[in-house]
C-alpha cells in the first residue's frame, strides 16, 4: 500500500490559538478507516487512539457485558502476530507509557501514549504501535484468560457500586424504555459473564469471536494519531499499521474463499483511487454512528412518551441529590439534529446559571441548595437527556415537591413570556462567549486523552457537526468564520434573524421541558416518609440486582401549587450582560481576524522545516521581597503560551494564630462564606473561562490561599472582590449574617460527608496523611470543631486573622499586565507587607513551627484501621514503607529505581496473577519531609489478608527475583532500561501503576469554581506545582524525578541495591519503617456474601421460571449462613413443602451449587473456605510463601493521633 491509496480531505479546522503550531489532517485509509493526524513538534510523546463503532448496546441479551469483556480481552490476550498474553501492557510499563480503554453503549475506544524514546535506532512508538494494531486484525481470545478478565470486570463493577454518578446512570436505565438496549445493564459482572453463560451452555470464546467478526472492520473504525513527526510520516504509520485491517466486504465474504475476497478487495481499492480525492463534501457524508445504530434501533426511543413510571427514589445515606431529566429525541420532532445540538448546549448555559435571576440563586437563598449543575447525557444516537442536578440540603430534601413545582410552574413559564429582547441578548452573548472560550483555551497536554476524544468524535454525523468543528466538538449559532458574524450589528434584518432564533429556542424549551416529558431521580433517605402526595403505580421497595441499592419507582403527578408561590417577588431572568468580557475580545470581527491568522499559520505549518522543539523552561523569579513578603513571577515562552491570560496566587499565613482543628475549620468556613457572598457576582466570569480557588492550607497551618486565572483585568477585579469581602467579614460585625454562616457550615459539613463516602482507596490515602502529617487533623477532630463554630467565635477568628501580622506569598504567571496593581492593592487593603521595607520595621517572629511529617522509627511495623462508608462493600489498604528524607538524594534515587521495578512486576503479579484486587497501585509517595514507596489495593478481601499478600509479594520479589539476578541481569533488565528512560527525559511519573506521587498536591481546594478542563490543564497544574514548591521553600524548582542522581545510578551495583532493598524494603529487615492504613467496610463480610447470594439466586430462579416470594427467599439465604450446601438443602425443603420439588431436579440443584459457589469464591473465598488455584496462579503460587511473616511483628496503633501526641 502506498500513500496514493489514501484519500485526503482539505478541512479548515476551527482551532484554538494555542494549536497554531500544530498541523492537522483528516484522511481515509483504503480499507475505510477514517483517521485524524496531528503533528505537534513540541510533543514529548506520541499517542494513538482507535475507536470501534460498537459497544454494550450490541451485547447479546444472555451475555450482558460482552462488549466490555471484549475490550479487556483485546489488549490482554495477545494476537496471532504477538501471541504473548500481556505483552502490550509489559511494553507500555517498560517504556513508561500509559494506556487505557473504555466501552460505552455505542463505541469502544482503545488508546495509549509513549515517550519519544528510541531502541536500536527505531522509535519505540512505532514498534508498540505494530503490537497495538495487531489486536484489531487477528486477536487471540485465549479461554485461559477469559476468567481473569471477568474477575477484573467484577472487581471494577464492585468499585462502581458506591459511585453516585454510576448509580444515577443505572437509575436512568431503570426508567428507560425496556425495548431499547440502553435499558439493559451493560458493564457486566461475574453473574452475567460467567454464571449465566455456564447455565445456558454458552461458549464465551465463540461469542467473543462472533462479536469481533461482526463489528471490527475498517469502515467501523476511526483513528487518531498525534506526535512530533510530520503529518506525512504519521500518515504512513497509520497506513502501514492499520491499512490491512479487513474492510466490511472482506468480513462478509470471509467464508467464501480467499481468492474471491482478494479480488473484491483490490477492486474496491481501485475504485477508491479513482474516487473524488480531497473531496470535502464526501467527508460530510460520514455518519458512522448513525449508519451503524439506526438500523438496530429501528426508531425505538430510549424513553417512552407515556411511561408507567416517571420517577425513581433511591435510598442512600449520602448528601441528598435530585435530578430532573428531560429526554430529547430527534425522532417525531420538528427540530433538526442541528437544532438539538445547538439548543441543548445553550440549555446547559442557561440552566447552569448561578447569577441573580437564576434558579440556583433562588434555591440557594432559600437554604435548599448547595450546588446546581446542568449538563446533557448522550444515551444513544438521536437520544440525549437534559439533566438538571441539584445538590440539596436537608431542608431542600424536605421541599422537593416545592422545588419541582417551582421549576415546572414558575421558572419555565417565565422564560416563555419574558421580553424576548433579554433572550436575544443572552443568545448573542453566549455565542460570543463560546467563540472566545474556544479560541483562548490552552493546549491539550495529555495527548492520548485528546486522541481518545477525537477518535470518538470522528464517528459523529459530520454533516450535522461539520468537519471544521471536529476540535470544537459542537456547533454554534454563528461560527467564527461565518460571513454572518456581522449579524451582531443591530440592523433590522439582523434583529429579525435573532428574534427567530430566540422564538425557536423558546419552542425547544416548551417541547421538551414539561411535566409529561420529565423523569425525576432522587437519592436520599426515602424511608422517612412519602415525598409526594400523589403517586401512581408505586412499586414496593426492592434491591437492584446489579448495583444493590434499595429503590422504588412511581408515577408522580405535580399539580400547580400557586398558593405557596403567589406572594414570591423573585423574578427569574436570563443572564444579563457579562462585565468580565474584556474589550479586546468583545468584537466578533476582531475574533474572526484572530482565528483566520491562527488557521493560516497552522495550515502552512507543513511548509516549515519539521524541527522538534519544546517550550523554553524558565524558572520562577523572585522579583521583590522583604521579611514578611515574597513576589514571584513566571514568564512563559510566547511561542507556546498565550500572553492574554494570567494566573495569580496569593497565600496569606497568619503568623500569630496557633495551628489547630478549630483554626482549620474557621478558615474552611471563611472560604465558603466568601464563596456564598461573591459567587453570584462572579458567575459571569466563569462563563468566559475564568477560574478561582479559595483554600485553607492542605498541610493544616493557618494559611488562606487564593488562585485566580483568566484575562488580566478580570483577574484583578476578582482579587479586589475577594479582598473587599474578606475585609467586611473581618471588620464589620453587622456584615455577616447568621444565615450566611449557617450555609457556610452546611457546605463544609457536606464536603466532609462527601469525603467520608468516597471510595475506600481515597480514604486510605488520606488516612496516611492524617496519621503522619503534623497538622492534618482527623475527621472526628474537624467535625467536633465545626460543631463548636458559632458566629461570635468565627468573627473573633476572622478579626485576629485580619489584624495579626501576616506573611504574603504572591505568585503571578502569564500576562503580568496587572502584577504591580495587584501587589499594591493587597498591600493597601489587606496585608500591609510593603510597610516593612518602607518603614524599616522588624520582621514578625513566627511563633509556631511549620508543618512537618512524623519520621517513622526504624523497626516500625504498624497499622491502623478505619471504617469505610456504610454503602461501600469494598476494603482497601495503603502499605507505606518509608525509605528516606526528602533531601536524601541517594536513597531517593534508589526509591525511584524501586518504583520502576514495581511498575514491571506489581500489577502483573498482584492483580493479574494473584488477583488480590481490581485496583493495584505501587510507587513513590512524597510527604512533607519524607519519601517512601507505597502499595495500594482495593479488594473484597480484608485488610489483614491484603497485608499478608503484599508481604508475600515483597518476599517473592526479594528471594525469587532480585536474589537470582546476576550483575548482568540487574543491569540488563532493571538498571539500563531505567537509565535509558532518564536520559530521554521520559520519567515524568509512572502514573498508570503508581498513582499520584504527592498526595498533598492532590487535595482539592475548599472552593473550586470554573471549567474542569481549565482547572486541570497544563498551565494550571504547573502553576500549582510551582506555588507549592515556593510555599515549601524548595526553590530549586526541580521535578521529583529530576533529583535522581544519574551518576550514582551509573555506578550502582547489584550488591548496593540489594543492601538498600534488604534494609529499607524487605519484610525480613529489622530496620524497615512501615505503616499500613486499612479501610474496612462496615458491612459484615458474611452479610455482604448473603446479600450477593440472595441477588444471584433471585435472578437464577426468575430466569428458570420459579415463583418464590422475596421474603421467603431472604429467610432461606439468611438461614444458610453463607453455606452453599445448606442453601440448596433449604431450597429443596421449601419446594418439597409446595409439592414442586420435581421442578428443581438434580441438574438445576447442581447448577445452583456451582454458580453460587463460583461467585462467592471470587470475592469471599477466604471467608467461606474456598481455595483459588488456576494455571497462571499456580505457577507463581509455588514461589510464594503463604506463611511469610515480617521479622518485626505487626502492631496496631491505638488511634490516628498516636504519633501527633507522642512526637508533635
Swiss-Prot record:
Record-stated family: Belongs to the peptidase M16 family.
Localization of this protein: Bud neck
Note, other: Present with 623 molecules/cell in log phase SD medium.
One Pfam family it belongs to: Peptidase_M16
Major enzyme class: hydrolase
Enzyme nomenclature, EC number: 3.4.24.-
Species lineage: Eukaryota, Fungi, Dikarya, Ascomycota, Saccharomycotina
Gene Ontology CC annotation, any one: mitochondrial matrix
GO MF terms, alphabetically ordered: metal ion binding; metalloendopeptidase activity
Keyword check for Metal-binding: yes
UniProt keyword Protease, yes or no: yes
Active site: 71
Phosphoserine: residues carrying this PTM: 262
Annotated protein name in UniProt: Putative protease AXL1
Subunit structure: Interacts with BUD5.
Role: Probable protease. Involved in axial budding.
